[in-house]
């Protein structure tokens, strides 16, 4: 067990880690009862050292850690980095970089969609991780030796996984495929949670400009309230209540209280008054200034095309050993079915080369799908036409 509890010890270990080409990083945190995640433990490892940092230790200053996270000479290796990076951003307004996310890399290398750390350790390192501390309350002190050992294991095996994935990416020429994902993960915009943008999580739940205006205001109010009180959004209002408010747009306390999902008694509280004020602001918005609502791509006769694109995506994913989610999602397929020039990742960069071009060819009948020996295969238009035109063998009369 190697547990860091003082600023001096943290500075010393970070200085040693900074001399290495990469460090593996993980965090343990709690967020079940708060809006902002509460950092409890940070795990760090280099090629020859692994430690856990007690982020809740009295008097501990995490500045040396944040300096290491910002060091451009050291690659920071995480698995499923997004929540870890969010915590660092919230605390220090920096994002660890350069960054390597082994979950993303594993998806490019054919290990499946969003493979867990435990499964990756099992597959790559042939080790089954101890899961006895999986549901630990990491805010409780003192930390037991078994808990610290469990936490450190999350960065020790990550070293071997990083090396193996790096080699595989270089061998296949796919190292550059990670650049878009890493750029997204290292963008501050990914972690900024501004109340004005809270409505975007529900953008497909309303269809009328008036409803959108109300949704933008009430979602923004909830976001600001949850942040200010540091409680989960659902503690303020559940998601379905926001949609009900947007669609019904009640304009009085009585009307608010009559909504089926609205919390009883809140309609005549301070929060109720603020919600009614938010609804009025939403109704007063000029429809011309509202974001454009995307029409439902699942309508308009594109359903069959989307289903074919799903088959094509699965075929390409399996044949190239790349997780389907890394190539395209259902929203991308719906967009491509509706518009050849859709602004989706699947029609840009390596994704376009691997999938997008063929998706458009399939959509316009220049590519066909068939089954050979139980597997879906692609046929170019000319090849498919020749097969269709090939005369059937004459039947031989019996007898």
Swiss-Prot record:
Major enzyme class: hydrolase
Ranges where the 3'-5' exonuclease domain occurs: 4-170
Keyword terms of this UniProt record: Cytoplasm, Exonuclease, Hydrolase, Nuclease, tRNA processing
Signal peptide coordinates: none
Physiological role: Exonuclease involved in the 3' processing of various precursor tRNAs. Initiates hydrolysis at the 3'-terminus of an RNA molecule and releases 5'-mononucleotides.
Keyword Hydrolase: yes
GO molecular function list: 3'-5' exonuclease activity; nucleic acid binding; nucleotide binding; ribonuclease D activity
Major location (coarse): cytoplasm
InterPro entries (UniProt xref): 3'-5'_exonuclease_dom, HRDC-like_sf, HRDC_dom, HRDC_dom_sf, RNase_D, RNase_D-like, RNaseH-like_sf, RNaseH_sf
Highest taxon of the lineage: Bacteria
Similarity remark: Belongs to the RNase D family.
CDD domains, A to Z: RNaseD_exo
Compartments where found: Cytoplasm
SMART domains with a match to the protein in the record: 35EXOc
An annotated GO BP: tRNA 3'-end processing
Cofactor(s) needed: a divalent metal cation
Residues of the HRDC domain: 208-289
Catalytic activity: Exonucleolytic cleavage that removes extra residues from the 3'-terminus of tRNA to produce 5'-mononucleotides
Species annotation: Methylocella silvestris (strain DSM 15510 / CIP 108128 / LMG 27833 / NCIMB 13906 / BL2)
Name of the protein in its database record: Ribonuclease D
């Amino acid at each position: 067990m190697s547990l860091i509890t003082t600023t001096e010890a943290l500075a010393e270990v970070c200085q040693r880690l900074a001399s290495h080409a990469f460090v593996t990083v993980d965090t343990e945190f709690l967020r079940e009862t708060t809006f902002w995640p509460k950092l409890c433990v940070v795990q760090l490892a280099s090629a020859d050292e692994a430690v856990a940092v007690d982020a809740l230790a009295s008097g501990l200053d995490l500045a040396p850690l944040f300096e290491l996270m910002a060091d451009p000479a050291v690659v920071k290796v995480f698995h499923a980095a997004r929540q870890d990076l969010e915590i660092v951003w919230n605390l220090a307004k920096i994002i660890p970089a350069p960054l390597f996310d082994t979950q993303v890399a594993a998806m490019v290398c054919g290990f499946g969609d969003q493979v867990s750390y435990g499964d990756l350790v099992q597959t790559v390192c042939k080790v089954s991780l101890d899961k006895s501390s999986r549901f630990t309350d990491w805010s409780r002190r003192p930390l037991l030796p078994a808990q610290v050992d469990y936490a450190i294991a999350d960065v020790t095996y990550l070293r071997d996984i990083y090396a193996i994935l790096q080699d595989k990416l270089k061998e296949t020429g796919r190292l550059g495929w990670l650049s878009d994902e890493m750029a997204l993960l290292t963008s501050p915009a990914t972690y900024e949670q501004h109340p004005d943008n809270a409505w975007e999580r529900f953008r497909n739940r309303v269809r009328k400009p008036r409803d959108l205006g109300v949704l933008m205001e009430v979602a923004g109010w909830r976001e600001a309230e949850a942040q200010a009180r540091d409680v989960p959004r659902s503690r303020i209002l559940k998601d379905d209540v926001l949609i009900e408010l947007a669609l019904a747009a009640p304009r009085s306390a009585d009307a608010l209280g009559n909504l089926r999902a609205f919390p009883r008694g809140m309609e005549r509280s301070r929060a109720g008054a603020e919600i009614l004020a938010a609804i009025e602001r939403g109704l007063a918005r000029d429809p011309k200034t509202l974001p454009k609502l995307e029409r439902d791509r699942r309508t308009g006769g594109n359903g069959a095309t989307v289903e074919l694109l799903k088959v094509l995506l699965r075929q390409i994913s399996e044949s190239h050993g790349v997780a389907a989610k890394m190539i395209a999602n259902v929203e991308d397929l719906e967009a491509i079915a509706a518009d050849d020039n859709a602004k989706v990742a699947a029609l840009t960069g390596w994704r376009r080369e691997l999938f997008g071009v063929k998706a458009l060819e399939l959509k316009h009948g220049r590519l066909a799908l068939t089954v050979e020996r139980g597997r879906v295969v692609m046929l170019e238009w000319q090849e498919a036409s020749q097969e269709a035109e090939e005369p059937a063998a004459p039947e031989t009369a019996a007898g």
